[in-house]
């Protein structure tokens, strides 16, 4: 018996990996976060599969379902939104699986920041503008951020920021970043990237909060901050330069 942690991707059913889809179809038990994983993803499960929405369950209850499946020698598809390695809370589940000597696998998924970049139609790593992306969040009701990982510190890098779980914390986001990025720094607020009701709000650090408040969007969004969001000044990369030689493009 094996528990398969599966990244469902950002939302669109056709953005799940083939491996993820096939594992959901093959497992007799499917546990999924109903608040974040669309019904179309869960529909890949077999008709006779036991499908359980874990949104109202705590960790002990989720593990109880897994232990029941283990006792019945039934594989489990544990479906998480996005990529399970990012804010998927799989760490505590893995710790318990190891204690119970239950095998597990992890199938990656398309992460939210990649879906947001696609929705915006841009590259996040432009030469001379930004070559670094920091994936982070802010602390509200969730666990505290480790020392040194607050936005005031991360902002000193000037890197492009992909800020998760912070739709209701834009006041702090803007307050902490304006000293490092400037009030005119572009910001994109992407609500439910790749879902049918996806919304994109563009602004700057000085006005994005008011724009989001006016749209009455308070959850399930990612905030991108950086100059890459609004520039045509980037130089071309060296990758395709005529004088750039490598083993597959020898001189002449």
Regions found by a protein language model. Give the residues of each.
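Class I S-adenosyl-L-methionine
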Residues: 1-110, 115
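A contiguous loop/helix-start segment that scaffolds small-molecule binding in enzyme catalytic cores
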Residues: 2-5, 61, 72-76, 132, ...
């Amino acid at each position: 018996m094996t528990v398969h942690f599966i990244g469902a991707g950002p939302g669109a059913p056709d953005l799940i990996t083939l491996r993820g889809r096939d594992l959901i179809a093959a497992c007799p038990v499917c546990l999924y976060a109903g608040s974040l994983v669309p019904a179309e993803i869960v529909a890949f499960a077999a008709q006779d599969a036991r499908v359980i929405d874990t949104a109202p369950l705590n960790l002990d209850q989720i593990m109880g379902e897994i232990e029941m499946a283990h006792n019945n020698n039934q594989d489990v598809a544990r479906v998480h939104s996005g990529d399970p390695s990012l804010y998927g809370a799989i760490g505590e589940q893995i710790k318990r699986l190891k204690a119970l000597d239950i095998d597990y696998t992890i199938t990656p998924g398309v992460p939210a920041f990649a879906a947001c970049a696609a929705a915006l139609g841009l590259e996040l790593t432009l030469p001379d503008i930004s070559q670094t992306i920091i994936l982070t969040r802010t602390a509200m009701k969730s666990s505290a951020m480790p020392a040194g990982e607050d936005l005031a510190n991360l902002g000193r890098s000037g890197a492009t920021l992909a800020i998760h779980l912070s739709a209701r914390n834009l006041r702090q986001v803007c307050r902490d970043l304006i000293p490092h990025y400037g009030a005119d720094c572009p910001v994109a607020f992407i609500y439910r990237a790749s879902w049918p009701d996806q919304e994109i709000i563009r602004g700057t650090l000085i006005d994005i909060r008011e724009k989001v408040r006016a749209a009455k969007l308070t959850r399930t969004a990612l905030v991108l901050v950086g100059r890459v969001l609004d520039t045509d000044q980037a130089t071309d990369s060296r990758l395709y330069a005529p004088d750039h030689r490598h083993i597959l493009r020898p001189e002449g």
